[in-house]
């Protein structure tokens, strides 16, 4: 792999989640962030606000152009779940084919929609495609106090994958600002999600009880 600060990123789906994880790519790239990253949004009114909030250039609706312009090492793929498969077929499949035809190294794919799973991307993009599904830790601050280190980001690896140990170490480094990283199989992530949702509901109930009950 390249050194961390030399990695190039394209964000497809520059919404709230990609703004929330800005501490991760900001720490990784430092003052090279603005030249090493490019975000794409489908919302005209969000272009300037997202660029200002994240410190990276953001363009409107040109996913294919962003990929060709940046030739990214990593694609942060965060469209709405309903658009994940259509954008894979219309944008990612042609771009990966272009990379192969030119003899270029394929970019890593960080897919944020929970579905499709990594197996789908491998079927569409090739089984040598390095893809993970990612559910970031979404509780990084409570009442103004940082608590990210108590949480974890769930990274789901396809059952058959070609990720190397140093690349998995990179994933841990990238997500470190949001806490620990837990690597899961597709079967394990379903259980982990159920437990996580149950914990969230219980915590809300306990807080409501604490508020309602007398001292």
Kindly give the residue locations of the regions a language model identified.
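Short glycine/serine/threonine-rich phosphate/pyrophosphate-binding segments
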Residues: 16-21, 84-86, 118, 203
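A structural micro-motif
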Residues: 35, 56, 107, 129-130, ...
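Internal alpha-helical scaffold of NAD(P)-dependent oxidoreductase catalytic cores
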Residues: 120-130, 147-191, 198-215
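Rossmann-like NAD(P)(H) cofactor-binding subdomain of soluble oxidoreductases
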Residues: 63-65, 70-149
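Short, hydrophobic beta-strand segments that form beta-sheet elements in well-ordered domains
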Residues: 37-42, 109-112, 155
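NAD(P)+-binding Rossmann beta1-loop-alpha1 motif at the extreme N-terminus of oxidoreductases
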Residues: 1-74
């Amino acid at each position: 792999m390249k050194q961390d600060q030399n990695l190039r990123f394209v964000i497809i789906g520059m919404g709230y989640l990609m703004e929330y994880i800005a501490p991760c790519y900001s720490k990784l790239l430092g003052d090279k962030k603005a030249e090493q990253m490019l975000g794409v949004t489908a919302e005209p009114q969000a272009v300037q606000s997202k660029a200002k909030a994240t410190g990276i250039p953001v363009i409107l609706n040109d996913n294919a152009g962003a990929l060709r312009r940046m030739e990214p090492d990593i694609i942060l793929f965060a469209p709405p779940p309903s658009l994940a498969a259509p954008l894979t077929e219309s944008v990612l499949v042609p771009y990966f084919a272009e990379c192969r035809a030119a003899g270029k190294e394929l970019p890593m794919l960080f897919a944020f929609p929970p579905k499709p799973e990594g197996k789908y991307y491998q079927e569409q993009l090739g089984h040598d495609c390095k893809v993970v599904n990612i559910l970031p830790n979404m509780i990084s601050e409570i009442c103004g106090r940082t608590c990210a280190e108590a949480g974890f980001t769930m990274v789901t690896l396809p059952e058959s994958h070609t990720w190397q140990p140093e690349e998995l170490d990179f994933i841990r480094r990238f997500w470190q600002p949001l806490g620990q990283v837990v690597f899961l199989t597709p079967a394990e992530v379903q259980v982990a999600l159920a437990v996580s949702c149950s914990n969230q509901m219980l915590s809300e109930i306990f807080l409501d009880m604490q508020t309602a009950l007398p001292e």
